[in-house]
From Swiss-Prot:
<feature type="region of interest" description="Catalytic">
    <location>
        <begin position="243"/>
        <end position="534"/>
    </location>
</feature>
<dbReference type="InterPro" id="IPR036621">
    <property type="entry name" value="Anticodon-bd_dom_sf"/>
</dbReference>
<dbReference type="InterPro" id="IPR002314">
    <property type="entry name" value="aa-tRNA-synt_IIb"/>
</dbReference>
<comment type="subunit">
    <text>Homodimer.</text>
</comment>
<keyword id="KW-0648">Protein biosynthesis</keyword>
<keyword id="KW-0436">Ligase</keyword>
<keyword id="KW-0862">Zinc</keyword>
<dbReference type="InterPro" id="IPR045864">
    <property type="entry name" value="aa-tRNA-synth_II/BPL/LPL"/>
</dbReference>
<dbReference type="GO" id="GO:0005829">
    <property type="term" value="C:cytosol"/>
</dbReference>
<keyword id="KW-0547">Nucleotide-binding</keyword>
<dbReference type="InterPro" id="IPR006195">
    <property type="entry name" value="aa-tRNA-synth_II"/>
</dbReference>
<dbReference type="InterPro" id="IPR004095">
    <property type="entry name" value="TGS"/>
</dbReference>
<comment type="similarity">
    <text>Belongs to the class-II aminoacyl-tRNA synthetase family.</text>
</comment>
<keyword id="KW-0067">ATP-binding</keyword>
<dbReference type="Pfam" id="PF00587">
    <property type="entry name" value="tRNA-synt_2b"/>
</dbReference>
<feature type="domain" description="TGS">
    <location>
        <begin position="1"/>
        <end position="61"/>
    </location>
</feature>
<dbReference type="Pfam" id="PF02824">
    <property type="entry name" value="TGS"/>
</dbReference>
C-alpha cells in the first residue's frame, strides 16, 4: 500500500489507494478546499486520480503556476459547456491553454457577433457560479469514440482516429450534461473558474491547414482571483494605448497598405528613427571591431540548395525567375556573407573575421500572421557572422553576450531572459557536431554568470542558439537577440582558411543578431516609450515657437543655431496662439519646446518646456544647446531636470 512523501520530507502511510484530494483532506480541510490537482512523481494528475504505489506528492493550488494553467484549461471546457447550451449544434474542435488564457476553436453555422460573445460570457458565469463538480472518467478508445459520434462531435472523432492509440484510455470530463475529452488535469469543481473574460474571436483553419475548414476561435483570459484579472485587463488597456500601430499613425512614422502586405512604407519621421538606430548600431560595430558589408538581396536557387535552406525553408522564401534561372529573395544573410568570406585566400591570422550587415530580408509569412511592424514580410536585420577557429569560439561568444547586454541597456531594458535552444528533429550535421556546439554555448553563458534555461529541440536546423528575450514596461516578452553556432554552413559553401600547419581548415560561423528585425525593434520601442522616444531617438528633438510675428527673425536665427549644433529642430511660426502650438507639439511627443517672446529676444534667452509639461524657465541659449548636445550624445533616457 502506498507511502506518500510530501515536499517537506514527511510521509503518510495508507492501506489503500488514495488520491491527491484524499491526502489533502488528511492534512486539513483548508488545503483540501484549495486543491486543484496533484504532482505525483513529477507528473501532473487530477485531484481524483488514485495513487496505488509509493510516490512523492505535491498539492497544486491556485497559487502555483500549474494551478493557474489548469484553471485556464478548465475555463476552455466551461466555454464549451456554455456554447453548447446556447447553440447546441456547435461542433467543438480544440481548446488549449495559451499565454494568459485559453481559446476554443468551434464550428458554428453563424458568425459570432460581439453580442453573441457577451451572451456566451454571461452563460459561462451563470454555469461557473453553480460550483458544480467536474467528473473525470477514463474510458476505452471505442467508448470515447462512440460517445462523440452520438453527440455529432466530428472533430473529436477525428482526433481519436488520427491522434490517439486504440489501446489508450482517453479522459472524458463531465461538466453536467457537457462532455469534453482531454489529457487533463482539470479543476475538481467550478468554484475555481469564476475570474475570466472572453477577449476576441478570430478565424482558424482546422489543424492549421488552409485546405481545411475555417473555424471560429474564441479567446479568453482567466485568473485565480478578481484582483489578478483586473490587473491584467488594466495592462491590456495600457498596451492598447501604447499600440505601435496607433502611435505610428498619430506620429506619422509609417504606414502599411494592401498592395504591399507586410512591407513598410517609412515616412520621414519614422525613417529618421530607423537611421538613428543604424547610427547607434554602427557605433557598436566599430567598438566591437566588425566590418560592415552589403550583399545582394537575391541569389540563384542553386546556392540555397547547397546551404540546405531550400529543403528546410522553401515555403517561406519568395522566388522569381529570369532567363531560365530561378532566384530566391534572401530570407537571411548568412549565405551571402560566406560568399564574401570566400573571396581571396584566408589565413588563421585573418580570424576572427566579424562581418556585419543591415541585411534586407524577405520571408513569406502567412497573411493572417502579419501585425504592424511586429510581424512583416520585408525587414532589415542587424545581422553579423563571425568566422573563427574552434579555439576562438568561447571568446567570441563571450564578446557577443557582452555586446547584447551593452546595447539593450541603452534602451533601459533590464529584465532579460536567456534560453539555449538545442537540436531539433529536423537538422543537418552529426550528433558529435551538435554536442560540441551546445556545450560551447552553455559554457559561455556560465562564464558570464548568466542564468539560462534549455529549450529542447528549438534550435535552427544548422546549429544551436542562445536566445535573448527582453521584457518591456508591461512585462511583455520580446525575443530579439540570437547568438548561434554553425558548424555546417561553412563546409557546405566551401569556406576555408589556411591553418598554422599550412593545411586548409573549415572555419566555424557564429550567427549574431541583437536588435533582430529593425522594424520590429522600432515597434517594440514605440510601445515601450509610448511614443515618448528619448531625445537622441526622437524624429524632431526641438520645436522653436514665436508668440507674435515680432519674434520670427529671432526664432529663425535660433533654429539655424540649433541645426548647426547637430540638433533636429523645426521652427513653428504659424499665426496661432502659443497654447495651441504647445498642445500640438506635446501631442507629437516632441521632447523640447522653446518659446520666444519679447523678453527672451531682449535677453538673448529662450523659455524651455518639456513634452511632459515641465517649465524649465528662461535659459541662456548656449547653455540649452550644450545641455541638449550632452543629452543626445550620451543617449540618455532622461530629459533635462528629470
Amino acid at each position: 500500500m502506498p507511502v506518500i512523501t510530501l515536499p517537506d520530507g514527511s510521509q503518510r502511510h495508507y492501506d489503500h489507494p488514495v488520491s491527491p484530494m484524499d491526502v489533502a483532506l488528511d492534512i486539513g480541510p483548508g488545503l483540501a478546499k484549495a486543491t486543484i490537482a496533484g504532482r505525483v512523481n513529477g507528473e501532473l494528475v487530477d485531484a481524483s486520480d488514485l495513487i496505488e504505489n509509493d510516490a512523492t506528492l505535491s498539492i497544486i493550488t491556485a497559487k502555483d503556476e500549474e494551478g493557474l494553467e489548469i484553471i485556464r484549461h478548465s475555463c476552455a471546457h466551461l466555454l464549451g459547456h456554455a456554447i453548447k447550451q446556447l447553440w447546441p449544434h456547435t461542433k467543438m474542435a480544440i481548446g488549449p491553454v495559451v499565454d494568459n488564457g485559453f481559446y476554443y476553436d468551434v464550428d458554428l453555422d453563424r458568425t459570432l457577433t460581439q453580442e453573441d460573445v457577451e451572451a456566451l460570457e454571461k452563460r459561462m458565469h451563470e454555469l461557473a457560479e453553480k460550483n458544480y463538480d467536474v467528473i473525470k472518467k477514463k474510458v476505452s478508445w471505442h467508448e470515447a469514440r462512440e460517445t462523440f459520434v452520438k453527440r455529432g462531435e466530428s472533430y473529436k472523432v477525428s482526433i481519436l482516429d488520427e491522434n490517439i492509440a486504440h489501446d489508450d484510455k482517453p479522459g472524458l470530463y463531465h461538466h453536467e450534461e457537457y462532455v469534453d475529452m482531454c489529457r487533463g488535469p482539470h479543476v475538481p469543481n467550478m468554484r475555481f473558474c469564476h475570474h475570466f473574460k472572453l477577449m476576441k474571436t478570430a478565424g482558424a483553419y482546422w489543424r492549421g491547414d488552409s485546405n481545411n475548414k475555417m473555424l471560429q476561435r474564441i479567446y479568453g483570459t482567466a485568473w485565480a482571483d478578481k484582483k489578478a484579472l483586473n490587473a491584467y485587463l488594466q495592462r491590456l488597456e495600457e498596451a492598447a494605448k501604447r499600440d505601435h500601430r496607433k502611435i505610428g499613425k498619430q506620429l506619422d512614422l509609417y504606414h502599411m497598405q494592401e498592395e504591399a502586405p507586410g512591407m513598410v512604407f517609412w515616412h520621414n519621421d519614422g525613417w529618421t528613427i530607423f537611421r538613428e538606430l543604424e547610427v547607434f548600431v554602427r557605433s557598436k560595430l566599430k567598438e566591437y571591431q566588425y566590418q560592415e558589408v552589403k550583399g545582394p538581396f537575391m541569389m540563384d536557387r542553386v546556392l540555397w540548395e547547397k546551404t540546405g535552406h531550400w529543403d528546410n525553408y522553401k515555403d517561406a522564401m519568395f522566388t522569381t525567375s529570369s532567363e531560365n534561372r530561378e532566384y530566391c529573395i534572401k530570407p537571411m544573410n548568412c549565405p551571402g556573407h560566406v560568399q564574401i568570406f570566400n573571396q581571396g585566400l584566408k589565413s588563421y591570422r585573418d580570424l576572427p573575421l566579424r562581418m556585419a550587415e543591415f541585411g534586407s530580408c524577405h520571408r513569406n509569412e502567412p497573411s493572417g500572421a502579419l501585425h504592424g511592424l511586429m510581424r512583416v514580410r520585408g525587414f532589415t536585420q542587424d545581422d553579423a557572422h563571425i568566422f573563427c577557429t574552434e579555439e576562438q569560439i568561447r571568446d567570441e561568444v563571450n564578446a557577443c553576450i557582452r555586446m547584447v547586454y551593452d546595447m539593450y541597456s541603452t534602451f533601459g531594458f533590464e529584465k532579460i531572459v536567456v534560453k539555449l535552444s538545442t537540436r531539433p528533429d529536423k537538422r543537418i550535421g552529426s550528433d558529435e557536431m551538435w554536442d560540441r556546439a551546445e556545450a560551447d554555448l552553455a559554457v559561455a553563458l556560465e562564464e558570464n554568470n548568466i542564468p539560462f534555461e534549455y529549450q529542447l529541440g528549438e534550435g535552427a536546423f544548422y546549429g544551436p542558439k542562445i536566445e535573448f528575450t527582453l521584457y518591456d514596461c508591461l512585462d511583455r516578452a520580446w525575443q530579439c537577440g540570437t547568438v548561434q553556432l554553425d558548424f555546417s554552413l561553412p563546409s557546405r559553401l566551401s569556406a576555408s582558411y589556411v591553418g598554422e600547419d599550412n593545411e586548409r581548415k573549415v572555419p566555424v560561423i557564429i550567427h549574431r543578431a541583437i536588435l533582430g528585425s529593425m522594424e520590429r525593434f522600432i515597434g517594440i520601442l514605440t510601445e515601450e516609450f509610448a511614443g515618448f522616444f528619448p531625445t537622441w531617438l526622437a524624429p524632431v528633438q526641438v520645436v522653436v515657437m514665436n508668440i507674435t510675428d515680432s519674434q520670427s527673425e529671432y526664432v529663425n536665427e535660433l533654429t539655424q543655431k540649433l541645426q548647426n549644433a547637430g540638433i533636429r529642430v523645426k521652427a513653428d511660426l504659424r499665426n496661432e496662439k502659443i497654447g495651441f502650438k504647445i498642445r500640438e507639439h506635446t501631442l507629437r511627443r516632441v521632447p523640447y519646446m522653446l518659446v520666444c517672446g519679447d523678453k527672451e529676444v531682449e535677453a538673448g534667452k529662450v523659455a524651455v518646456r518639456t513634452r511632459r509639461g515641465k517649465d524649465l524657465g528662461s535659459l541662456d541659449v548656449n547653455d540649452v544647446i550644450e545641455k541638449l548636445q550632452q543629452e543626445i550624445r550620451s543617449r540618455s533616457l532622461q530629459q533635462l531636470e528629470e
